[in-house]
């Protein structure tokens, strides 16, 4: 039995898809455990780039099982579209498994998401308007519709009718929005369920059976630790738990079966949407990193906010998610800069602090304390080992490792699978 969890250790978009794809080569089962189609992941290999939102990165390996766990909120329309996208590109989805306990995103969730965000005016949290939050709200309120319900026509009809009556009253009285039609949603989404039914099963059984039989299982998170609803920059967070602890709830696998937690991070920091960002750059360097790193949202296409590497954030991620290894991505993006800064602490009310405050008021008053390192000019996109890197690039990686207190197991010097370089095999010591 061996398992590895890949989490984003910043604010998402850290290259989890690439690292998951890379680690999938030695896994037999790959599983998503939370989130929805609000976050995309990009995988590049053999000269082609694929962008997915719901289906795990392991789908590109025909000999591996890919699982969408019960902690995911699933938009059937998006999933059917994604399946067609893969089929059109010659990718088989025969090994996909979908949890019958996953909750379903329906049109009223998406409408409500947009209405709630618009009503906040200057206090927007930067939702992607994919219905994620409202779907998790229904789940917590025990009125959600699960995949198992979607497949049972009478059950789906009854629950949809009840929920839609309530949502339509809310739309009309609270927001002045026209009601949604039951017939339009019911027929369309029941049909989606029929298209998906052959993939649906109890994925907790599949995952536990795999682990108990000695297979390697890789768990893939969405978003990042700093967007976790409990441990992130609340309320500027997602509605689920991307931290490694979310695996046990979102997949039905007990905590004793988790062996390693790999934190994916960039050699700098990025963020999409509103919320605190202590090391954010508002200058030409930030613009340069954004363009060189193609820092635009996979799903939203919004330009990402850019900042220096923040070791305070990373130590927080290490603590709350139990990071055992780091995968450092996008080192090549920093090539050409004369100097590179790393945030080592914050200054708050004249004192240095080394933890990430919960209070938004305190966060807004924090000033990053920087350490400046010399940059490098050499092209590193073909480097395969640490020794191949320029001395300044090596020193930068070592300094990140020292400040975070977690060993760097891989570093990447480009978007392709072949540009990911292994320093320590995560699977080897389990």
From Swiss-Prot:
Source organism of this protein record: Ligilactobacillus salivarius (strain UCC118)
List of catalytic residues: 13 (proton acceptor), 41 (proton donor)
EC code(s) of this entry: 6.3.4.4
Name the record gives this protein: Adenylosuccinate synthetase
Catalytic activity: IMP + L-aspartate + GTP = N(6)-(1,2-dicarboxyethyl)-AMP + GDP + phosphate + 2 H(+)
Subcellular location: Cytoplasm
Binding site for IMP: 13-16, 38-41, 128, 142, 223, 238, 302
Sequence positions that bind GTP: 12-18, 40-42, 304, 330-332, 412-414
GO cellular component terms, A-Z: cytoplasm
GO molecular function: adenylosuccinate synthase activity; GTP binding; magnesium ion binding
Residues binding substrate: 298-304
Residues bound to Mg(2+): 13, 40
Protein purpose: Plays an important role in the de novo pathway of purine nucleotide biosynthesis. Catalyzes the first committed step in the biosynthesis of AMP from IMP.
SUPFAM superfamilies (alphabetical): P-loop containing nucleoside triphosphate hydrolases
Gene Ontology biological-process entries: 'de novo' AMP biosynthetic process; IMP metabolic process
Pfam families listed in its UniProt record: Adenylsucc_synt
Record flagged with keyword Magnesium: yes
InterPro entries referenced in this protein's UniProt entry, alphabetically: Adenylosuccin_syn_GTP-bd, Adenylosuccin_syn_Lys_AS, Adenylosuccinate_synth_dom1, Adenylosuccinate_synth_dom2, Adenylosuccinate_synth_dom3, Adenylosuccinate_synthetase, P-loop_NTPase
PANTHER family: ADENYLOSUCCINATE SYNTHETASE (PTHR11846:SF0)
Family to which the UniProt record says this protein belongs: Belongs to the adenylosuccinate synthetase family.
Subunit structure and binding partners: Homodimer.
Pathway field: Purine metabolism; AMP biosynthesis via de novo pathway; AMP from IMP: step 1/2
Swiss-Prot/TrEMBL cofactor(s): Mg(2+)
Keywords: Cytoplasm, GTP-binding, Ligase, Magnesium, Metal-binding, Nucleotide-binding, Purine biosynthesis
Comment on bound cofactor: Binds 1 Mg(2+) ion per subunit.
Database matches in Gene3D superfamilies: Adenylosuccinate Synthetase, subunit A, domain 1 (3.40.440.10), Adenylosuccinate Synthetase, subunit A, domain 2 (1.10.300.10), Adenylosuccinate Synthetase, subunit A, domain 3 (3.90.170.10)
Protein's UniProt keywords contain Transcription: no
């Amino acid at each position: 039995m061996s398992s590895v969890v890949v989490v984003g250790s910043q604010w998402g978009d850290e290259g989890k898809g690439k690292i998951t794809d890379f680690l999938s080569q030695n896994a037999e089962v790959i599983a998503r455990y939370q989130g929805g189609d609000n976050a995309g992941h990009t995988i590049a290999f053999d000269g082609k780039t694929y962008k997915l939102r719901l289906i795990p990165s392991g789908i590109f390996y025909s000999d591996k099982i890919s699982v969408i766990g019960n902690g995911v909120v699933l938009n059937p329309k998006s999933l059917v579209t994604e399946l067609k996208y893969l089929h059109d590109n010659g990718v088989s989805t025969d090994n996909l498994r979908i949890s019958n306990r996953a909750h379903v995103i329906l049109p009223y969730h998406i409408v409500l998401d947009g209405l709630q965000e618009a009503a906040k005016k200057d206090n927007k949290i930067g939702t992607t308007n994919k219905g994620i939050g409202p779907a998790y709200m229904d789940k917590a309120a025990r009125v959600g519709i699960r995949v198992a319900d979607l497949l049972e026509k009478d059950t789906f009809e009854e629950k949809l009718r009840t929920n839609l009556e309530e949502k339509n009253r809310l739309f009309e009285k609270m927001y002045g929005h026209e009601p949604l039609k039951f017939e339009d949603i019911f027929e369309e989404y029941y049909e989606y369920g029929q298209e998906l039914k052959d993939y649906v099963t109890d994925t907790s059984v599949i995952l536990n059976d795999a682990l108990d039989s000695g297979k390697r299982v890789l768990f893939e998170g969405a978003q990042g630790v700093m967007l976790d609803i409990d441990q992130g920059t609340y309320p500027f967070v997602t509605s689920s738990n991307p931290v490694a602890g979310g695996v046990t709830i979102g997949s039905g696998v007990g905590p004793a079966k988790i062996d390693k937690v790999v934190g994916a991070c960039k050699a700098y920091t990025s963020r999409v949407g509103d919320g605190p960002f202590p090391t954010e750059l508002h200058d030409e360097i930030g613009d340069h990193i954004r363009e060189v790193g193609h820092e635009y949202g996979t799903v939203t296409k919004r330009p990402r906010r850019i900042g220096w590497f923040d070791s305070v954030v990373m130590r927080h991620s290490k603590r709350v998610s139990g990071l055992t290894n780091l995968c450092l991505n996008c080192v090549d993006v920093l090539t050409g800069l004369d100097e590179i800064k790393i945030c080592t602490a914050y200054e708050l009310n004249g004192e240095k602090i080394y933890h990430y405050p919960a209070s938004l008021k305190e966060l807004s008053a924090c000033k990053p304390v920087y350490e400046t390192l010399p940059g490098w000019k050499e092209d590193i996109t073909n480097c395969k080992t640490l020794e191949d890197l320029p001395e300044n690039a090596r020193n930068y990686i070592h300094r990140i490792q020292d400040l975070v207190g977690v060993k760097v197991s891989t570093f990447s010097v480009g978007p392709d699978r072949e540009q990911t370089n292994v320093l320590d095999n995560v699977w080897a010591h389990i």
